[in-house]
């Protein structure tokens, strides 16, 4: 998806991160299904009947200073960047609460045992899993395949870099999947913030130049080559740099689409650093 979903070293985080589910680094792990957090395993998906439910899988990093939003530093300090990232993750989870007929998973990096993720799971009764794969494409392919192996009728993968991602995006994606094989939510930098499907689509993630502005175009070309019909959501701006923050707040001034938590953090950061530029 958009930029969230790249392997999570600080070095990679500083590069342009188009084409990942705005969220977090990807850890390598065994090629089995994502493990659920122990307290949520029992009784998971009790309403699941004949593939009637969907899955939303949010890719996220733990908000560790120096490991997230590094392309905003400077002007932000590492702890400010981590605070912003944590707000984005929490709001991404909370904005799924109104959805019905879906189970919510949080795909975690560096791992689902991190206290930040355990707290979110306990508070919102979401399911946790690890990101599994050597690169972004493998992680997304694994997550989708695991969802379908569990019997879900469709699965949507998203990141956490789109502050105004809301229920309408998920509802529109689900509607598009009724007549398409794949749905993508483009970002303005050439990546995507959401990818959804009704069945495994490994072709979509093969030989993609992750962290470039070619991700969306290459992904659509792979889909076309595989005979997959693609539906597109409206494009959105993700937050990778402080210039993105400035631009987003200008654009949102009339729309008022920001959740309160992230909105407060962004406005505070603008007050502190509004005229600053990277050194």
Where are these regions (language model features)?
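A short, N-terminal amphipathic alpha-helix
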Residues: 83-102
């Amino acid at each position: 998806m958009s930029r969230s979903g790249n392997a999570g070293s600080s070095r990679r985080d500083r590069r342009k991160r188009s084409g990942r589910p705005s969220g977090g680094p990807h850890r390598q792990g065994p090629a089995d299904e994502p493990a659920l957090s122990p307290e949520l395993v029992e009784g998971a998906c009790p309403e699941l009947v004949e593939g009637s439910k969907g899955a939303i899988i949010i890719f996220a990093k733990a908000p560790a200073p120096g490991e997230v939003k590094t392309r905003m530093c400077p002007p932000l300090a590492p702890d400010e960047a981590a605070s912003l990232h944590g707000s984005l993750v929490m709001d991404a989870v909370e904005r799924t609460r109104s959805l019905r007929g879906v189970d919510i998973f949080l795909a975690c990096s560096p791992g689902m045992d991190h206290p930040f993720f355990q707290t979110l799971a306990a508070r919102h009764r979401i399911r946790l899993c690890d990101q599994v794969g050597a690169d972004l494409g493998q992680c997304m392919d694994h997550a989708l395949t695991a969802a379908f192996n569990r019997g879900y009728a469709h699965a949507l993968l998203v990141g956490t870099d789109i502050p105004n991602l809301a229920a309408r995006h998920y509802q529109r994606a689900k509607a598009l999947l009724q007549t398409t094989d794949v749905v993508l939510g483009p970002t303005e930098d050439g990546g995507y913030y959401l990818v959804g499907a009704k069945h495994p689509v490994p072709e979509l993630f093969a030989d993609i130049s992750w962290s470039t502005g070619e991700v969306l175009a290459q992904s659509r070309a792979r889909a076309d080559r595989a005979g997959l019909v693609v539906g597109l959501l409206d494009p959105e701006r993700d937050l990778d740099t402080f210039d993105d923050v400035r631009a987003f707040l200008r654009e949102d001034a009339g729309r008022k689409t920001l959740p309160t938590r992230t909105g407060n953090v962004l406005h505070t950061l603008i007050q502190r650093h509004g005229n600053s530029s990277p050194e």
